[in-house]
């Protein structure tokens, strides 16, 4: 740190212990100056020769023969006035970055200009600032920090602007010319670990200045960053790194995505300023930092404009995000645990970039302007879209654990990435299964719409094994999973595809998703939507073993396993159809009979018996038809 000594006489200021300061001198004091409760007993001649303010005040008090002057409004208080008084007496005064602003403002208040006396205090301080302090990196930052208590006078004296300009100029210097000390704690360089103290002995990073600027208050920090952007062409990554460092330093808990209790107004100002200072270049800041800013914006209840700006920026690089970073807590008073709507906006912004269009203005033959909208190819790579789909699938699994999350919000987020072709739907299946597990009371329509999102053909063998044994899924989905696993096993061994009953097979082959059966009659829809009973689930579970045996056995054994599996599926569907028809007949004409001797339990037992009979009939009838059909094809 640089300093300057002014004067040559010894310091002869004394105190009597009662806030009274005096100069030890043979001459008695002839003027008393009061400064905020402290009294200075001094002499007129040295003070009046350099201070125009005291001359004016003393001339007005002499008329009443009063030699007491009150200057409690002087900047810097008693300490700054004492420094100015010592300069008037010629005593040694030491100025540094810590007290130069207070002394400069006090000298301005006292009117210690060159017009009063050549070589006055103001002139000497200005020379010290321009020739020494403003040429030092850390001293300039300290001087700028000390101007805060003396606003607006320090601003009027251009001390603030001069400091900001000096700091920005230093930050824009080529790194090869950086020869001063700075704070940089990101990583220890090899030269530092070996004990090398010379700055020239190591490479200077481009963001060498970012940590030192974190000492500034947000209003000064904003002005310095803006000045840096104006003075030199720095990469957006450097500015982004500076904003990131400031956020981590100034916002408690920001690195962990939380906001500790404190001055919310101050935190809000910092967050909104950081968002405003974000570089325009894409990828100048990481997606993780942007999401932390968005979480902080939500916590301090910033305006929608700030949120929308962050949503647009995050949507441009969503492929960099992780699932944990997308878990944005809802504001207080919200029913849901996470702000799902905000994440959906981000996903929609990401997908919007893949649907760009361009308006081209042309002149026709008559001279009129004609606008033509041309669709341009998307700018998103397949890898980026797959990464986003993977993250959203994991995000869906996590938010599905919230018991208060409506099914509509879960489905809306999942549907926002349905246009992305994914090689596997295992993660989506896990998310749907988690939601069904945590929300057993959802409606049949919601369950249908949710299962429609999943393509059974893209489930792995492990996922298929789990799905067939999953009693939370509708029977229709279970049958689809089993059928497509049969098809996959048949294709891998070169055997023929197993047959299904007419209508059901056509529907399954035409689509692999759950919601593609609009042409199926209503009665069939009800049968599909039904959840399998315990007996039916046990029958379906046994088919998984057959799927694995198919690959190990030959073509003949596979055909037999396929026939058996499909026959059992038929029997399950037939049993439900017979049961459904019986219930319909009873509801139309058997109301009185049901109210008579037979109760609900007797009806159920009859239905179960009918189902068993239908199963036996299907088991004996259908395999022969399937085998006959296979022979005719071969």
Swiss-Prot record:
Residue list for modification Phosphotyrosine: 429
Domain NPH3: 207-488
Gene3D superfamilies according to UniProt: Potassium Channel Kv1.1, Chain A
Pfam families: BTB, NPH3
Positions of region (Disordered): 492-517, 584-634
Localization terms from the record: Cell membrane; Cytoplasm, Cytosol
Name used for this protein in its record: Phototropic-responsive NPH3 family protein NPY2
Source organism: Arabidopsis thaliana (Mouse-ear cress)
Gene that specifies this protein: NPY2
């Amino acid at each position: 740190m640089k300093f300057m000594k002014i004067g040559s006489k010894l310091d002869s200021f004394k105190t009597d212990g009662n806030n009274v300061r005096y100069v030890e001198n043979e001459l008695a004091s002839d003027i008393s100056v009061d400064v905020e409760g402290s009294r200075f007993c001094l002499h007129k001649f040295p003070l009046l020769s350099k201070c125009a303010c005291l001359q004016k005040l003393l001339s007005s008090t002499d008329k009443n023969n009063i030699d007491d002057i009150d200057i409690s409004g002087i900047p810097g208080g008693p300490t700054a006035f004492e420094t100015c008084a010592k300069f008037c007496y010629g005593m040694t005064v030491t100025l540094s970055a810590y007290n130069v602003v207070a002394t400069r403002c006090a000298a301005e208040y006292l009117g210690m200009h060159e017009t009063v006396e050549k070589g006055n205090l103001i002139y000497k301080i200005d020379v010290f600032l321009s020739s020494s302090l403003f040429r030092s990196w850390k001293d300039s930052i300290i001087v700028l920090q000390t101007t805060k208590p003396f606003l607006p006078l320090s601003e009027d004296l251009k001390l603030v602007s001069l400091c900001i300009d000096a700091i920005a100029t230093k930050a824009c210097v080529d790194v090869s010319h950086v020869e001063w000390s700075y704070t940089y704690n990101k990583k220890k360089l090899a030269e530092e670990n070996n004990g090398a103290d010379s700055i020239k002995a190591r490479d200077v990073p481009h963001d060498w200045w970012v940590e030192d600027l974190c000492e500034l208050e947000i209003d000064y920090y904003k002005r310095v960053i803006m000045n840096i952007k104006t003075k030199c062409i720095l990469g957006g990554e450097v500015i982004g790194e500076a904003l990131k460092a400031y956020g981590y330093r100034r916002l408690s808990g920001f690195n962990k995505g939380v906001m500790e209790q404190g001055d919310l107004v101050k935190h809000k100002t910092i967050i909104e300023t950081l968002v405003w200072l974000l570089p325009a270049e894409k990828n100048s800041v990481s997606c993780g930092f942007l999401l932390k800013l968005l979480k902080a914006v939500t916590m301090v209840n910033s305006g929608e404009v700030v949120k929308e700006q962050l949503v647009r920026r995050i949507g441009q690089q969503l492929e960099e995000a992780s699932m944990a970073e997308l878990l944005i807590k809802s504001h207080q008073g919200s029913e849901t645990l996470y702000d799902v709507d905000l994440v959906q906006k981000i996903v929609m912004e990401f997908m919007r970039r893949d649907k760009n269009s361009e308006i081209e203005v042309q002149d026709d033959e008559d001279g009129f302007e004609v606008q033509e909208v041309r669709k341009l190819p998307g700018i998103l790579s397949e890898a980026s879209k797959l990464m986003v789909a993977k993250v959203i699938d994991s995000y869906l699994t996590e938010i599905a654990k919230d018991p208060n999350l409506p099914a509509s919000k879960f489905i809306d987020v999942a549907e926002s990435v349905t246009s992305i072709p994914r090689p596997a739907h295992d993660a989506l299946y896990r998310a749907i299964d988690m939601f069904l597990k945590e929300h057993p009371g959802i409606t049949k329509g919601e369950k249908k719409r949710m299962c429609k999102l999943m393509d059974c053909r893209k489930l792995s063998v492990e996922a298929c094994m789990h799905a067939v044994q999953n009693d939370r899924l509708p029977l229709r989905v279970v049958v689809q999973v089993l059928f497509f696993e049969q098809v996959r096993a048949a294709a891998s061994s070169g055997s023929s595809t197993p047959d299904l009953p007419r209508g059901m097979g056509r529907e399954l082959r035409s689509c692999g998703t759950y919601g593609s059966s609009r042409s199926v009659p209503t009665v069939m829809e009800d049968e599909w939507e039904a959840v399998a009973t315990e007996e039916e689930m046990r029958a379906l579970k046994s088919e998984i073993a057959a799927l694995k045996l198919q690959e190990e056995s030959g073509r003949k054994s596979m055909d037999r396993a396929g026939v058996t599996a499909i026959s059992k599926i038929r029997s399950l569907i037939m049993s439900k159809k017979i049961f459904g028809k019986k219930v319909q007949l009873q509801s139309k004409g058997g109301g009185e009979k049901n109210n008579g001797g037979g109760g609900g339990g007797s009806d159920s037992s009859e239905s179960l018996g009918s189902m068993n009979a239908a199963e036996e009939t299907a088991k004996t009838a259908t395999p022969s038809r399937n085998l006959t059909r296979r022979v005719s094809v071969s």
